[in-house]
Amino acid sequence: MAALAAIFDLDGTLLDTLGDLTAAVNYALGELSCPRRTREEVRSFIGNGVPTLLRRSLPAGADEEMHRQAMALFSAYYGENMTKTTAPYPGIPWLLERLSEDGIRLGVVSNKKHDATQPLCRRFFGALLGCALGARDDSERKPNPSM
């Protein structure tokens, strides 16, 4: 039986977002007078959404107030700068076009906030994706099957 649909993750699968994520992490850390993180450190901290990324990026012993401030700073910066260096990985647009031409419905499910997932998918993949779902405060996150 041929596949009817294909669902992809966004960060690190379809899009290389590491540069913009690193810049946003380091902006927040700098504003809080914390040491900056390297690109490789940020790469190792990614997984399970931005709150976890920032917990891993903040210095040991950072309290919840510092985490809250880092979240606000990161979100504001990333919202304005999330496409500075972000781009599809080589071959991804071609792959999605071929799958779509073969009648396979395409979608994205991401732990990235929904308000960031939507514009990134529209900008880089346009009408190729039938749906793009990101994390919301009132819903489960991947890998929960209900997402």
Predicted regions and their residues:
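Core-facing hydrophobic residues within beta-strands of well-ordered domains
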Residues: 3, 96, 128-130
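Substrate-recognition "cap/lid" segment bordering the active-site pocket of phosphatases
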Residues: 84-87, 107, 113-147
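Active-site neighborhood of HAD-like aspartate-dependent phosphohydrolases
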Residues: 1-44, 55
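Short alpha-helical
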Residues: 20, 49-52, 94, 115-116
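Helix-loop "lid/cap" segments that line or gate small-molecule binding pockets
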Residues: 28-29, 49-64, 120
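Metal-dependent phosphoesterase signature
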Residues: 55-94
